[in-house]
Amino acid sequence: MAGKKVLIVYAHQEPKSFNGSLKKVAVEELSKQGCTVTVSDLYSMNFEPRATRNDITGAPSNPDVFSYGIETHEAYKKKALTSDIFEEQRKVQEADLVIFQFPLYWFSVPAILKGWMDRVLCRGFAFDIPGFYDSGFLKGKLALLSLTTGGTAEMYTKDGVSGDFRYFLWPLQHGTLHFCGFKVLAPQISFGLDVSSEEERKVMLASWAQRLKSIWKEEPIHCTPPWYFQE
């Protein structure tokens, strides 16, 4: 949709990977719609994933005992976070939609993407207490997880060996994105890359491109325990 801004937070080491292809499809399709698309390619940026004292410029508010959450909150208010954090926060603030593109690692995100979430979505910028979930500071924005798995779709069902995929998405979609106020769209999961044929991969890419054509018309999922755990 013309005028919309999209941030793609991309976490894969190899540009020629299937994740790279999914990212490329998203950039091309959304650009065709007139969207402004920005990509944070975390590996090529050498993005620092560690949450440390070095994220704060100047003296800490408590020089005796360091608390990352407290210190980054204070630093955000004083504009004393490092430039790489502020730059990513600027991208998020400007975006109408944030797409996270990554391979599933141990039922979660790669460490570099976890570090992005830890450092960028700090208190004061993304949330406060009170000021979370539906009152989170990123309310009004959309977020979407686009991920790939080695295992097949059958493995990630309620009766499958890995359990329903909704279970492992709970911490990411509800505990992180919804907590910060995002409206969360249904995930785009490309299953079974370890066993998929070239033709099957082409179908996955085409399906992603087709979905993106109407992405702005989608309704967000219900970020509640019943949706995730089928209560």
UniProtKB/Swiss-Prot annotation:
Keywords attached to this entry: Cytoplasm, FAD, Flavoprotein, Metal-binding, Oxidoreductase, Phosphoprotein, Zinc
Catalytic activity: 1-(beta-D-ribofuranosyl)-1,4-dihydronicotinamide + a quinone + H(+) = beta-nicotinamide D-riboside + a quinol
Cited Pfam families: Flavodoxin_2 (PF02525)
Record keyword Transport present: no
Domain of life: Eukaryota
GO molecular function: chloride ion binding; dihydronicotinamide riboside quinone reductase activity; electron transfer activity; FAD binding; melatonin binding; oxidoreductase activity, acting on other nitrogenous compounds as donors; protein homodimerization activity; resveratrol binding
Residues given in the record as FAD binding sites: 12, 18-21, 104-107, 148-151, 156, 194, 201
Keyword Plastid: no
Function, as annotated: The enzyme apparently serves as a quinone reductase in connection with conjugation reactions of hydroquinones involved in detoxification pathways as well as in biosynthetic processes such as the vitamin K-dependent gamma-carboxylation of glutamate residues in prothrombin synthesis.
Name of this protein: Ribosyldihydronicotinamide dehydrogenase [quinone]
Organism of derivation: Mus musculus (Mouse)
Lineage: Eukaryota, Metazoa, Chordata, Craniata, Vertebrata
Name of the gene encoding the protein in the UniProt record: Nqo2
